Every structure is written in C-alpha cells, then in structure tokens.
C-alpha cells in the first residue's frame, strides 16, 4: 500500500511539475508580447506630437499591426470577458461622445479647453491602463516568488520527510503534508490560470485602447477642423459686430443730425407762431384802420346817396329818353330791315352779273380754243384731200386694169381694204370732234344751272344762248356728219373747191353768232351800270342816316365809357387786393415747398431706415438659421444622450445579470466549500481507520522495512530529479526577472517621456489660460462699452421726453390758437350772414341792371349786325362794342366766380368746423389720458414702494436663510462647496441673463410704444401744420373778401368793432390761461424729473443690493473654507440640520406668500416681476440645496468628479449662451438705436400700449403658472431621487459591513488553518502574511467605496438627463433593485452574525483616514492646474482600489 501511494505521489508530482513548466513558458511568452506592445506604445506616444496626430492616424506602424494580429488570436483572447472593464470603457465612450456633442454645440473659445481636458483624460486613462499592467506584472512577480518560496518550503518539507521516514510513526503526517502540498499546487494552478485570464484581458484592453487612441486621434483632427471653422465663424461674427457698431455710430450721428433738424423745425414753428401773433396784431391794427376807413366811407356813402338820388332822377329822365330812343330805334330798325332787303337784292343781282361776265370771258376763251381746233381740223382736211388725190390716181390706174378680168377680184378686195382704212381714219376724226362738242356741252350745262338759280332774266338770256349754241352745234355736227357720210359714200366724187367753200361758210356763221352775243352782253352791261348808279345813290342816303345814328351811338358810348371808367377803378382796386392775395399765396407756396422738402428728407431718412431694417432683418434671419442649426444639433445631442442612456440601462441590466451569475458562482463555491468540509470529515474518519490499521501494521512494518528502504532509495532518486527540475525553474525565473527588470526600465523611460509631454501640454494650457484671460478682458471692455451705450440711450430717452414735453406745450398753444380762430370764425360767420343778406339785395339790384343791360345789348347787337352788313366802316364801332360786351361778360363771370368762392368758403368753413371739433375731442381725450396716466404713475409709485419694502423683507429673510445655509454647508468638503459655488454663480448668471432679456424686451416694448406715439404725434403735427396753412389761406382769402365787402357794406362795421373788442378781451383772457397752463406744465415737468431721479436712485439701490449679495457670497466662500476644518462636527450637526429643515419649511411657506404678493405685483410692473421671479428661483434653489446637503452628507466624495464634469459642461454651455446673448444684445442695441431714430415719428399710442400690456400681463401670468407647475414637478423628482440615494447609501453601508465581516472571517480561518497544519518554525510566515494582508483588508473596504462611487456616478449620470421623460421609470427600477439588494444583504448579515460578530467601527477605520488625506489637500477648481490635480488624485485612488480588488481576488482563490 505504501509503495502504491508513493508511486501515485511521484506521478502526481511529475504531472504538476510539467503543468507548472508549461504555464511558466506561456506566461513568459505572454509577458514578452505585452512588454513589446507597451514598448511600442511608449515609443509611439513619445514620437507622436499633437500636430502629427493626423499622420499617425493615416499610417500606423507595422509593429502595432503585428501586435494587434498577435493579440487578436483566438488562443490569446480566450472565452473570458471582463465585465468591469467593459463598464469603464462604455462609460468613458459615453462621456467622450457627450463631450463631442457639446464641443459641436459650443462656438466659443472654451472648445480649446475642452480639447485639452479630453486629451488629459485620455492620457490619464492610458496611465491607468499602464499602471494596471504594471500592477499585474508585479502581482505575477509576487506570485512567482511565492511559488519559489513554496518550492523551498516543499524542499524543507521533503527534508523533514526524509528525516521522518527514519521513524515509521511519521508516515501519516507526511501524507497529510503531501495532501496539503497538492492543494497548494492546485491553488497555484488556479492562480496561474487567473493570471493567464488577466493577461488575455489585458491584451484585449490594450487592443481596445489602441482602437480608442485611433478614435481619439480622429476626433482630435475633427476637433481641429471644427476649431478652424469656429475661428472663421468667430472672425465673421466679429466683423459683423464691428460693422454693426459702425452702423450704430453712423445711426447715432444721423440721429443727432435729425435732432438738430427737428430742433431747427421747432424753432421755425416757434418763429411761425410769433409771425402769426404778429399777424394777429397787424390784423387788429388793420381792423382799426378799416374802422377809420369805414367812418370815412360812411361820410362818403351819405354823399353818394345824395348823388344816387340825383342819378335816380337822371335815370328816370334817361329812361324816358331811352323810351323815345327806343321808338326811334324801332323805326330806324324797320328802315334798316327794308334797306337790308334792298341791299340783299342788289348784292344778288351784282353777283349774278359778275357771274355772267365771268361766263362770257370763259366763252371767249372757249372760242379761241375752238378756233385753234378748227385750224388743226383744216390741216387734217388738207391731208385728207391729198389722200383723196392719191386715191384718185390709183383709181385711174385701177380702171385701166379692170379690163383684165382675172384681176377683178383682187381689185375688189383691194378696194374694200382701202375703203375700210379710209372709214377708220374718218371715224377717228369724227370721234375727236364729238369729244370736243361734248366738253363744250358740259360747260354750257353748268353755266345754265348757275344762271337759272340766280335770276330769271339771266336764265332767259342763257336759254337763248344755249339754244343758239345747240342749234349751231347741231348744224355743225349735221354738216360734218353729212360731209363724212358723203365722203364715205362718195369719196371719189368730192373735190378740193367744194371743201374750201364749206369751211368758209361755217366760219362766217360762227362769227355772226359771236357778234350777236357780244351786242346782247353790252346791252346787259349798260343796264347793270344804270342799276349800280341807282344803288349808289341809295347808299349815300343810307350813309347820311347812319351818320346821324353814329352820333347817337357816340353819346351812348360816352356814357358807357364813364361807367367803364368807374368799373376800371373798381377793377384796379380788385387787382391791388388780388396782388396782395398773390403775394400771400406765394408766401404760402414757399412755406409749402419748405415743408415738402422737409417731408422729402424725412421720406429719404425713412427709406434709409427701411433699408437698414431690411439689413437687420437679413442678419436676424441668418442668426435665426444659425440658432435653428444649433437647436437641431442640440436635439441631436439629446437624442444621442437618450440613446446613451438606454445603452447605459442595457449595461446596467447586463451588470445585474453578471452580478446574479457571480452570486450563483458564490453559492456554488459555498456548496463546494461544504463538500470539501464533508470530504475533510471523511478524511478524518479515514485517518482514524488508518491509525487503527497502523497499529495493526506495526507488526507488518518490521517485516516490510526492507521494502521501505528500497522505496526510500527510489524516493531519493525522484527527489534528486525534482531538485534538478527546481534548479531549472530557478534559472528560468532568474531569466524572467532580468527580462522584467529590462521592461521596467523601459516603462520608467516611457514614464519620463510622458511627463515631458505633460509638461509641454501644461505649458500649452498655460498659454490657453492667458488667451482666456485676454478674451475675458475683451469681454469686460465690451460690457463697459455696452454700459456706456446704455447711458447714452438713457440720455437720448431724457432728450426725447423733453421733446415730447415741448411738443405737448406746442400742441396746447396750437389748441388755444385754434380756439381763438374758432371764435374769430364764428364772428366772421355772423358778419358773413349779414353781408350775404346785403349781397342778396345788391344782387337783386344788380340782376335788374343786368336785365336792362341785356336788353340794351340785344339792341346793340342788332344795330351792330345791320352796321356790319351795311358798310365796312362800321366794323370799328362793332369791335368797340364787342370789347364792351366782353368786359360786361367778364364782370358777370367775376360775379359768378365770387359767388362760387363764397360757396367754397362756406364749405371750407364747415370742414374747418368739423376738424376743429375733432381736434377738440382729441385734446379732451389726451387730457383724460394724461389724468389717467398721472393716476397710474402715482399708483405705480406706491406699488413700487410697497414692493421695495417687500424686497427688503425678502432680503432679510434671505439673509437669515443664508446664515442657516452657512451652518448647513459646514458639513460639506471643499470640493463640493466649490462646485456648488460655481453652480450658484452659473444660476446667478442665468438669472442676470434673464433679467437682461426682460429689460431688453421692456426697452423694446417702450421703444415701440414711443415710436408709435411719436409717429402719430408727428403725423398730427403735420396735419395741424397743414390745417394752420389752410387756415392762413382761408384767413387771407377772408381778409380779401372782407375788404371787398367793406367797400360795399356799411352797417356791419360797427357791429364788428364791438365784436372785435370782445374778442380782444377773450384773447387776453386766453393768454392769461395760456400762461397758467405753461406754469402748470413746468410744475409737472419738475415732478417728472423728480420721479426720474427717484427711479435712478432705486436702480442704484438695487445695484448696491446686488453688490451686497456678491459680498455675502464671498463671505460664504470664506466660511466654506472654514468648513473643511470643522468636518468632524458633522454628526453633531445632524440634529441641527433637521431644525434648519423645519426653519426652511417655515421660510418656504413665507416665501409662498411672498410669491403670491409678487404675482400681484407682476400684473402691475414687469421689471419688478422679473426681479421677484429671480428671488423665487434663488430661494427654491437654496431650499433644494438645503435638502440635498441634509441628504447627501455621506455621498459628498463620490459625486465630486461627476459634478465637476457636469458643472464644466454647464459652464461651457452658459458661456456659449452668454456669448450668444451678448451678440444678440449687440444686435438688439443696434436695432434699439435704429428704432430710436424712428422714435420721432410716433405719438399718442397709449391705448394700444395699454392693451398690449394687458395681453403681456396675461401671458406672464400663464408663464408663471407654468413655471410653478414645473417647479412642483422638479420638487417631486428631487424628493424621489433623494429617496433613491438614501436607499443606495443604506445598501452600500450594509454591503461594506458584510465585506468587512467576511474579510475578518477569512483572516480568522487562515490563521487557524496555518496554526493547525504548520509546525512552530513556519508560523512566522503565516503571521507575516496576514500582517501584510491586513492593510489590504483595511483597504478592501475602499472597494465598497469604489462600488458606491460607481453607483453614485450612475445616479449623477441620470441627474444629467434631468429633463428626460424616463426618469420616473428609472427611479422605480432602481428602488426595486435596491430593495432586492437590501433583502439579500440582511440575510447575509444574519448569517454573518451567527458565524463571527464584528463591530461596525472597525469596518470604517480606513474611511476617516482617506477623508483626512483628501481634505488636507486644497482643491482649487478655479484654475485648470487645480482641476488636473484633483483628477490625478482620483486616478491614484482608482489605482489603489484596482490593486486592492486584485489582491482580494487572489486571496479568495487561495481560500
């Protein structure tokens, strides 16, 4: 049996040694691979600079590719996955992605800081990874040393066994030691396998980190491109800002010029008012003069009345004479009609005779033409005779040839052809003669028609002539036709003598007829001459009569000339007055031209403003597009964040599944432990049976000593072989140590290179900080410029207010002047009514005179008609009469025009009355609005005072709350306090930004209202100026008309004098009222100035309160510094926190009441409402801080890193928002200046502004209600989160207690086992090992902190998505998971209490040490160096925690 057991032991030892050698070889190979990869990574990181990232990304090295290929082999990767590393990688990826999205959103210089921070974080991650690898290497070295130590122990044990084999009783002890050695070897195998798994995992991590490095480099390239684009955009924005500032300066200059122009216009208006006053004084003087003239005219009227009576008498006598003259005229007219008839007859006869003479002359010309034609016909006849002679000769020759019979036919044909030719020639001649005769007949017929129309006697003569002519023509035609016929029938028989005799006879008959006609015409002419002499005698008689009548006409004309002279005098006076009117019209036209030029300039300025508004709109549209892009990117980031959140949830689920698997594994290990215990019990029973067998076998042992000696020799041989193998392993281990030393030297060199790179990057960070300081300085300068611009705007507003006051004064003066004008118009109406009555009477008289003149005119027209027809000498008289008639027509037209003017003036007066009524109504409405506004101002002042009191009370309450918060903040550490300070500063910035936005909106609304008011006022001023000019025109026309009417009218002047005196009295009273009104307006202006001064004082007080708040915040910072020293008093302050919470609740109830009051105040004033909303938000935030501070005392260290990242992101966002708001503010300032230039075109829009204010108040109410709802929802979410945090804290505390107890149990078990199985000399090692492990156990408690930190980070990550919709579901899931954990932990605690109780204070011993270490260091988050120090601290803690986890896992494997 012993031999078999020894063989079995030798075989097992051989197998174990072979497995150990194989494991060592694989470990060496993997260590070489990892060291080679680390060496390559170090060289690449040292060689690659930030500018060469793109080249590295584009061309990776061959060594890196080989390492990746070697590391990605399936033999090295294996099946294992390291879940915590996955978690870390995913969280880092998610944070990197979030940072990417944020970098894409931000368009400011903070992106450089983000890049530096990202690079720093990546470097820290690489360092962590390198540190993990180094720690793994160290752990492997320690394990190898422990294996070597165990081998030495085994050698010692073997020696002990050799010494013990001499004694037969020590064999079971050796067997037990062999069993222990086998267990230790199996544990070492497990450790080596775990080391292999870790190496594989480290290789995977290296691969993943290489991928992450490549991605980081690509991201750096992308970020550089983005930075270039952002820098370009920033330059463009700066250019646009500079252009906008330049435009603003130009607009301010234009605005100043416009102010000067408006001031000049106002001066001109004042000058015109003075001129009008002077004109009124001149009018009064003129009225006095006119009264004097009226007195003179009265005297003249009396004289004229007497003359008028005389003229009436003369008129009556003249009427009688006129009647006589009319009788004579009627007789003369009858004679004239008779003479006209005679003259018409004579003229007709003369015309007829003249026509007869003309016809005779035409006949003579026709005879001459006929003679010429006859001569031509004679010549043709001679030619015909020659032809006949020739034909005769030919006939003779033909007669000779008749004898020849065969030629008869030819002769006959020839004759026929000749006859035809002759006939054709004769027919042509006849046609020509017939055409001439026809033309003569037509002329004669026309003459007949004319003569038959005019006179019967001449018709007879014409009839005789035509009969003679026709008879002659017929005879001629018949003769010619007879001749032709005879020629045709008998051409051969005619001779030359006969033709000549015929022609002579024809000529003689024609001459006789012409002589007869001449005699007849001569007799007719003599008769006509006799008639002409008779007519001339009659004309001479008529001339004598006409001379008598012309003398009578001359007398009448002289009378008319006298009347015309009087009329010309009147016309001269009218022309003088018309000239005056023209001068006044010219002046009015000049003023109208001036006003039109001013209006044109205004229109040009308006067009320029419109163009600039269009530019601003285009810029606003560009800004809106960019804002939409940013919103779109922000929405994308939100979506990505939600996706990441979902991925994190999935990861959490995976981790939960892994935890469940781990729990299952733990349970399985417990089962295995129970099985092992059972095996131990079985082995103990077996040992007892072996003892029995040993007692029985002692007898047999003596027999088998020889066999054992042989077995001992075999064992010695085996031991010698094992010693050889151990020596080989020692040599291999020494080689490994040398290689590890080389690799460690290389790692140190890499560390030095990393430190150099860090120094360089720290220098770059320092440069960036300087640039940031410069930019902040520039921003401060821009803010100062904005403040200066605001000051200038306030000054311009004051100037505008003064101008509005002046405009109000001018309007009041205009209203008073209009009242005076209305009174004067009433007086003029009365005068017009009286004058219209007199005019009607005069017009009736005038109409009677016009009728008489019309009758005379008709008679004169008849006389002139007869005179024109009678002689040419009367034409002069006719022209004179026509001139007189034209003058009378002009007089009529003038009368009609005057009547039309009077009607137009009546219409204008009606229009002016309606306009004056409208103006009076508008003035009344304005006065009412003024009273209403004054009452509203008083009410607002009272409300302001009440609100200021409430603000002071609120400030006092806030001070008390601040003191309480100081006591609460004493609990927290410096890092969290600094973060909260930043958070509060950010919220203050947001509140200030909101206040700025509200103030800008208020200013915009005020500007819009003032613009509208100024536009309406300018429009009304223009209308009123037009009305004034129109009134000036009407007044001047009235003056002209009144002057004309004063000449005609008599009794109205006395009444007008009395009315003018009354008007003067009224004017004096109105002047006194004007002075009183001016004094009242001055008093009102003084009151308004006082109110403005009070408002400025209130603003200063508000600024002082803000400064005090800042000072209080600085005091809070100092007290927060003092908090770090008083951290040990946290436990005592727990009760005080509860009291403060109750006080905060009371203050919260008081603040709710204050909010209600603020809501009421917001309905009245929007500015104070914004301030009160800010106070509410601050109070709410501080309450939330108090609750969080009370609830998050135990989790302060865990949330620091996450809050820093969060606050930095928020600071970047807010800084970008601040930049965007500054740009928007600059744009709004530009638009404000442009709108300020438009201010002077608006007036009286208070009704619309009141409606707008009411609508805005309703909107503000709705927004406040929505904000209150959101605040209540946020409170609920915070409470839910606080519950989740409390549950997590409790669960973590329970886990930490469990872990410490389990560690104590394990340490106790190890101590007991070491004391059992090892002898006295080897107990020192077992004592040394727990001593070395005891700090690990103490540090193992930090593993729980690390886990707790992870949990808190997950919670804070969920806090980042504070506005996500899935928060409620997450909180519910977390609560359920924590409840499960609590249930499991309570069961574990109960089992732990049964096994080994341990105090709670021992588990928390390492915590205060770490806290003191953390608190001893100063965390300056205001600078990048302080933040980097803090990050390095956390990295070290993470390294320590990872080392502790590794040691804990190794100890668990050993157990």
UniProtKB/Swiss-Prot annotation:
This is Coiled-coil domain-containing protein 18. Disulfide bonds: none annotated. Residues 806-840 have a biased composition (Basic and acidic residues). The modification Phosphoserine is found at residues 47, 1356. It comes from Mus musculus (Mouse). Residues 799-840 are annotated as: Disordered. Residues 108-405, 441-473 form a coiled coil. Keywords: Coiled coil, Cytoplasm, Cytoskeleton, Phosphoprotein. Transmembrane segments: none annotated. The keyword Hydrolase does not apply. One of its GO terms (cellular component) is centriolar satellite. It is found in: Cytoplasm, Cytoskeleton, Microtubule organizing center, Centrosome, Centriolar satellite.
């Amino acid at each position: 049996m012993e031999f078999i057991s020894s063989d079995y032991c030798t075989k097992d030892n051989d197998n174990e040694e072979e497995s150990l050698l194989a494991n060592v070889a694989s470990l060496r190979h993997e260590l070489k691979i990892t060291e080679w990869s680390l060496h390559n990574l170090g060289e690449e990181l040292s060689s690659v600079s930030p500018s060469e990232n793109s080249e590295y990304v584009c061309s990776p090295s061959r060594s890196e590719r080989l390492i990746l290929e070697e590391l990605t082999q399936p033999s090295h990767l294996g099946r294992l996955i390291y879940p915590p590393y996955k978690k870390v990688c995913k969280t880092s990826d998610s944070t990197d992605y979030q940072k990417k999205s944020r970098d894409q959103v931000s368009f400011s210089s903070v992106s450089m800081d983000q890049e530096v921070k990202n690079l720093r974080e990546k470097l820290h991650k690489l360092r962590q990874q390198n540190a993990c690898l180094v720690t793994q290497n160290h752990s492997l070295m320690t394990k190898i040393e422990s294996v070597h130590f165990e081998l030495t122990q085994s050698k010692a044990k073997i020696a002990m066994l050799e010494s013990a084999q001499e004694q037969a009783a020590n064999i079971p002890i050796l067997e037990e030691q062999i069993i222990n050695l086998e267990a230790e070897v199996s544990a070492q195998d497990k450790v080596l396998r775990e080391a292999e798994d870790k190496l594989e995992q480290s290789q995977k991590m290296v691969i993943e980190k290489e991928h992450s490095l490549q991605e980081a480099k690509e991201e750096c390239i992308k970020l550089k491109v983005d930075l270039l684009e952002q820098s370009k955009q920033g330059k463009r924005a700066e250019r646009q800002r500079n252009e906008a500032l330049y435009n603003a300066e130009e607009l301010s200059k234009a605005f100043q010029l416009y102010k000067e122009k408006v001031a000049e216009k106002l001066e001109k208006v004042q000058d015109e008012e003075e001129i009008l006053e002077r004109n009124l004084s001149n009018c009064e003087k003129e009225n006095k003069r006119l009264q004097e003239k009226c007195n003179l005219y009265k005297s003249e009227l009396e004289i004229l009345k007497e003359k008028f009576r005389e003229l009436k008498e003369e008129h009556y006598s003249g009427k009688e004479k006129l009647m006589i003259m009319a009788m004579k005229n009627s007789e003369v007219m009858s004679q004239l009609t008779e003479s006209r008839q005679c003259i018409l007859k004579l003229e007709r006869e003369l015309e007829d005779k003249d026509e007869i003479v003309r016809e005779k002359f035409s006949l003579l010309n026709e005879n001459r033409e006929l003679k010429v034609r006859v001569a031509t016909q004679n010549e043709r006849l001679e030619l015909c005779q020659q032809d006949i002679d020739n034909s005769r000769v030919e006939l003779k020759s033909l007669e000779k040839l008749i004898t020849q019979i065969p030629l008869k036919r030819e002769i006959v044909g020839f004759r026929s052809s000749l006859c035809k030719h002759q006939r054709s020639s004769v027919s042509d001649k006849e046609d020509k003669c017939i055409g001439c005769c026809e033309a003569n007949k037509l002329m004669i017929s026309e003459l007949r028609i004319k003569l038959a129309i005019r006179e019967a006697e001449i018709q007879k003569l014409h009839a005789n002539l035509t009969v003679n002519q026709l008879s002659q023509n017929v005879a001629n035609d018949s003769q010619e036709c007879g001749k032709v016929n005879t020629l045709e029938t008998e051409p051969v028989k005619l001779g030359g003598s006969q033709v000549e005799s015929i022609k002579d006879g024809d000529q003689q008959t024609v001459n006789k007829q012409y002589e007869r006609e001449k005699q007849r015409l001569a007799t007719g002419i003599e008769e006509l001459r006799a008639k002409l002499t008779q007519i001339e005698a009659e004309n001479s008689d008529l001339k004598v009569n006409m001379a008598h009548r012309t003398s009578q006409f001359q007398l009448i004309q002289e009378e008319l000339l006298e009347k015309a002279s009087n009329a010309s005098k009147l016309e001269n006076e009218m022309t003088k007055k018309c000239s005056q009117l023209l001068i006044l019209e010219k002046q009015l036209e000049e003023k109208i031209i001036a006003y039109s030029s001013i209006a044109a300039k205004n229109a040009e300025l308006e067009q320029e403003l419109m163009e600039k508004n269009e530019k601003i709109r285009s810029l606003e549209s560009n800004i809106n597009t960019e804002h939409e892009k940013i919103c779109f990117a922000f929405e994308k980031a939100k979506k990505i964040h939600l996706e990441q959140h979902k991925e994190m949830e999935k990861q959490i689920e995976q981790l939960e599944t892994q935890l469940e698997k781990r729990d299952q594994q733990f349970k399985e290990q417990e089962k295995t432990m129970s099985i092992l215990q059972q095996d131990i019990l079985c082995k103990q029973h077996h040992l007892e049976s072996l003892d029995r067998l040993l007692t029985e076998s002692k007898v047999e042992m003596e027999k088998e000593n020889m066999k054992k000696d042989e077995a001992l020799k075999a064992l010695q041989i085996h031991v010698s072989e094992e010693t050889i193998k151990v020596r080989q392993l020692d040599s291999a281990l020494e080689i490994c140590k040398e290689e590890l030393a080389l690799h460690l030297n290389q790692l140190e060199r890499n560390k030095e290179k990393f430190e150099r790179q860090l120094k360089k990057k720290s220098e770059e960070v320092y440069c960036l900080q300087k640039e940031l300081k410069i930019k902040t300085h520039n921003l401060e300068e821009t803010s100062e410029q904005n403040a200066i611009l605001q000051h200038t705007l306030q000054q311009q507003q004051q100037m505008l207010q003064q101008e509005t006051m002046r405009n109000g004064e001018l309007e009041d003066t205009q209203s008073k002047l209009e009242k005076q004008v209305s009174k004067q118009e009433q007086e003029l109406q009365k005068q017009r009514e009286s004058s219209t009555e007199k005019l009607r009477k005069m017009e009736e008289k005038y109409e009677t005179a016009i009728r008489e003149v019309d009758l005379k005119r008709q008679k004169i027209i008849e006389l002139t008609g007869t005179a024109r027809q009678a002689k040419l000498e009367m034409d002069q008289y006719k022209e004179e009469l026509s001139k007189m008639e034209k003058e009378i027509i002009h007089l009529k037209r003038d009368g009609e025009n005057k009547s039309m003017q009077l009607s137009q003036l009546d219409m204008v007066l009606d229009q002016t009355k309606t306009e004056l009524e409208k103006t009076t109504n508008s003035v009344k409405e304005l006065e009412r609005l003024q009273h209403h506004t004054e009452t509203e101002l008083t009410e607002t002042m009272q409300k302001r005072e009440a609100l200021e009191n409430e603000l002071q009370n609120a400030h006092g309450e806030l001070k008390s709350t601040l003191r309480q918060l100081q006591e609460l903040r004493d609990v927290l550490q410096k890092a969290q306090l600094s973060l909260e300070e930043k958070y509060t500063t950010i919220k203050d910035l947001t509140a200030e930004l909101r206040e700025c936005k509200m103030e800008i909106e208020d200013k915009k609304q005020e500007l819009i209202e003032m613009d509208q008011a100024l536009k309406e006022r300018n429009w009304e001023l223009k209308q009123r100026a037009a009305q004034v000019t129109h009134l000036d025109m009407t007044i001047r026309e009235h003056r002209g008309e009144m002057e004309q009417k004063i000449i005609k009218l008599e009794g109205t002047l006395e009444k007008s004098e009395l009315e003018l005196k009354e008007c003067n009295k009224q004017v004096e009273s109105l002047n006194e009222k004007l002075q009183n009104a001016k004094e009242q307006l001055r008093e009102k202006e003084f009151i308004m100035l006082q109110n403005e001064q009070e408002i400025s004082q209130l603003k200063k007080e508000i600024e002082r309160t803000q400064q005090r708040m800042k000072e209080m915040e600085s005091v809070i910072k100092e007290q927060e510094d003092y908090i770090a020293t008083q951290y040990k008093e946290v436990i005592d302050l727990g009760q005080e926190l509860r009291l403060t919470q109750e006080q905060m609740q009371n203050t919260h109830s008081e603040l709710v009441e204050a909010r209600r009051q603020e809501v009421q105040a917001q309905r009245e004033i929007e500015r104070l409402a914004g301030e009160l909303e800010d106070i509410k938000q601050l109070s709410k935030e501080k309450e939330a801080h108090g609750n969080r501070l009370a609830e998050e005392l135990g989790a302060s260290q865990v949330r620091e890193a996450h809050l820093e990242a969060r606050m930095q992101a928020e600071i970047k966002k807010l800084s970008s928002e601040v930049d965007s708001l500054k740009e928007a503010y600059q744009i709004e300032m530009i638009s404000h200046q442009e709108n300020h230039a438009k201010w002077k075109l608006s007036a009286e829009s208070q009704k619309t502004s009141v409606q707008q204010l009411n609508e805005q108040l309703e909107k503000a109410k709705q927004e406040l209600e929505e904000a209150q709802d959101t605040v209540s929802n946020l409170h609920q979410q915070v409470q839910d989160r606080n519950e989740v945090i409390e549950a997590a804290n409790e669960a973590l505390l329970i886990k930490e207690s469990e872990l410490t107890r389990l560690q104590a149990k394990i340490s106790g078990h190890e101590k007991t086992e070491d004391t059992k199985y090892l002898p006295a000399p080897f107990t020192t090692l077992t004592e040394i090992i727990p001593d070395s492990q005891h700090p690990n156990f103490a540090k193992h408690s930090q593993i729980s902190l690390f886990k707790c930190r992870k949990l808190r980070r997950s919670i804070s990550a969920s806090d980042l998505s504070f506005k996500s919709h899935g928060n409620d579901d997450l909180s519910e899931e977390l609560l359920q998971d924590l409840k499960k954990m609590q249930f499991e932990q309570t069961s574990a605690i109960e089992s732990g209490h049964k096994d080994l109780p341990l105090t709670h204070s021992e588990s928390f011993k390492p915590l205060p040490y770490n806290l003191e270490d953390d608190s001893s260091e100063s965390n300056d988050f205001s600078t990048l160096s302080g933040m980097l120090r803090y990050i390095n601290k956390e990295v070290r803690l993470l390294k320590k925690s990872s080392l502790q986890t590794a040691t804990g896992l190794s100890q668990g494997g050993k157990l």
